[in-house]
Structure formats: C-alpha cells, structure tokens
Swiss-Prot record:
Molecular function (Gene Ontology), one example: structural constituent of ribosome
Family designation: Belongs to the bacterial ribosomal protein bS6 family.
Protein name stated in the entry: Small ribosomal subunit protein bS6
Gene name as annotated: rpsF
Residue ranges, compositional bias (Basic and acidic residues): 104-114
Keyword Heme: no
Keywords for this protein: Ribonucleoprotein, Ribosomal protein, RNA-binding, rRNA-binding
GO cellular component, one term: cytosolic small ribosomal subunit
Amino acid sequence: MRHYEIVFMVHPDQSEQVPGMIERYKTAITNANGQIHRLEDWGRRQLAYPINKLHKAHYVLMNVEAPQEVIDELETTFRFNDAVLRNMIMRTKHAVTEASPMVKAKDERRRDVAEDLDEEEVDDVAEDSEE
C-alpha cells in the first residue's frame, strides 16, 4: 500500500457536517485494511482567493496508507460532494506522523497564553500577600 496526503476544504456553511464526513472517510480507509497516520481538523480558515464567492473554508488534513481503490473512491466522493470546495490527494514516499506546521504554531500559541496566565496568577498572588 502507498502513502497519501489528503487535504480537502469544506463549504463553511457545512462545517457541522465535517466530523461525519471524516468518520465516513476513516471507515472507508480502515475497512480496506488501510491506516490513518495523521488526521488534523484545521477548522475554518481564510482562503487565499475567493472560491464561488466564499472567503473562508473548513480545512481537513489526513495522512493515510491505503490501497489505490480506496483513494479512487475518496476522489469520486469528493468530486460529487457539493460541500467539498477543493481537494488534493498527493502520494508521499513515507508515512507522515508528526504534527503539521499549522498545528505546531497553534500549540505554541496555546502554550504561550498558558504561560502568560500562570505569570499573571503568580503576580496576583504576590500582590494579595503584600496587602
């Protein structure tokens, strides 16, 4: 089986359907003895240019190992699903399991905010003890 990176963008009005779509695609891959190495739901993001007069879309990234038949099935599903604005399926040489730069940046921001909050709590406690 080969390794693939799949990115698809969903119409922003259909964002509530994304978890169900992901579940269907995961089931199709695992039923064909495939593996999902990485699955990231990036949420709504700004588009680089308008698509069908839309400026935002819901992004999903998957790195999978699956037979060609499943990939063909996913491609057909993407093509005939009106909620999917764009999709890209690329074959990769190896399984990619590490977090994408998008997720790494998000985690760093969360960590920075958490550290800032911890520092503020320490400052608040110090001020309270001085009074």
